[in-house]
Structure formats: C-alpha cells, structure tokens
C-alpha cells in the first residue's frame, strides 16, 4: 500500500536532477539532491516506504534518518548514496554537524506537516536547516492548517510570491478536532 506523502511530488524532480548534473545518474555518496523534513520517525519511515514503492524502477535512493536509532547504521546508509534524504529536524542537525551529510547538491526542500513541526518546537532546527542548504533551492511547505504562524513561516522561508494551493474549505476543522460549545 502506498501512502502518498508530499515527498511523492519531488520524485520526478530528483530524477531530473540526477540526469542533469555532470552526466551522473546515480546517488553520489552523502550529497542528497532533495531533503524532506518531517516531525516524527513514523513519518520518516512512511515517506521512505512510499518513495521506494513509487521509484522501484527508477534507481532513486531514499534514506530515512531519525533519532532513537544507531547513528552509525544511518551513516553507513548515507555513504552508500542518497538522492532523497527524509529526516526529522534534530537528527538532520546531528548528522550535518558531524559531517555525515553534505548539502551543496540540495535543490528541493520539502517541509511536511509544518504546523506539527512548529507545535513540537522544531522551529530553531528548521531555521538552522534552511540556513545550511544552498540559497538557490525550491522549498515546498505543507501544512494541514494555515494559521497566522504558518503564514509567517511561509513569508520567512518561501519565495516572495509563493504559489498557494488549498484543498477543502480552510475554515473547516480537521476531522480529528472536536469542537465544543460551553454555555
């Protein structure tokens, strides 16, 4: 079963980047071409599984990195080659600060579930991550809600006039939210 997360949108971009750069069509060690930032390890696993299913015949290497596991095992996976890196903010900063990952080839950054990242207190790490990727890159920001805080985040990290795509009614609460009225 494929759970199509926003990472699915960049599969084609990764394929384009692979073939344009210096004629190489395979993952180049610890230099990912795309980065997906998600709030939880469960989402890292989910996104990687979906990408692997969708790119089964494309030779695109997706590596998931998250805390709570052996960093050496994850380091070995990165050094085998990575096109698409899916990670939680804290673990990305760990592997970046330890020189395990290099960012100059990153062309696309996906910030998935931005509202949850903010709720979980990951804004400092998110800012740090966006400071270490190349200035010239595309950022895709996904959020279930579009609060004032998310609008400020978009203004801070996205192009001056980003394309905004909405699905559903923005005033309709998510089904998981229970609204009560007390009199």
Task: Name these PLM-found stretches.
Residues 1-183:
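SF2 DExD/H RNA helicase N-terminal ATP-binding lobe
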């Amino acid at each position: 079963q494929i759970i199509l997360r926003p990472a699915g949108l960049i599969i084609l971009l990764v394929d384009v980047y692979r073939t344009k750069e210096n004629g190489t069509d395979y993952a180049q060690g610890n230099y990912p071409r795309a980065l997906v930032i998600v709030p939880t390890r469960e989402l890292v696993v989910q996104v990687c599984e979906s990408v692997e299913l969708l790119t089964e015949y494309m030779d695109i290497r997706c590596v998931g990195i998250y805390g709570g596991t052996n960093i050496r095992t994850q380091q070995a996976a990165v050094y085998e080659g990575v096109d698409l890196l899916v990670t939680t903010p804290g673990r990305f900063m760990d592997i970046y600060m330890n020189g395990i990952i290099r960012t100059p080839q990153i062309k696309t950054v996906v910030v998935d579930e931005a509202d949850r990242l903010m709720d979980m207190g990951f804004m400092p790490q998110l800012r740090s991550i966006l400071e270490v990727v190349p200035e010239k890159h595309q950022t895709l920001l996904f959020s279930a809600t579009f609060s004032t805080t998310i609008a400020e985040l978009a203004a801070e990290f996205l192009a001056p006039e980003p394309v905004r795509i909405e699905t559903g009614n923005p005033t309709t609460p998510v089904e998981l939210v229970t609204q009560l009225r007390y009199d």
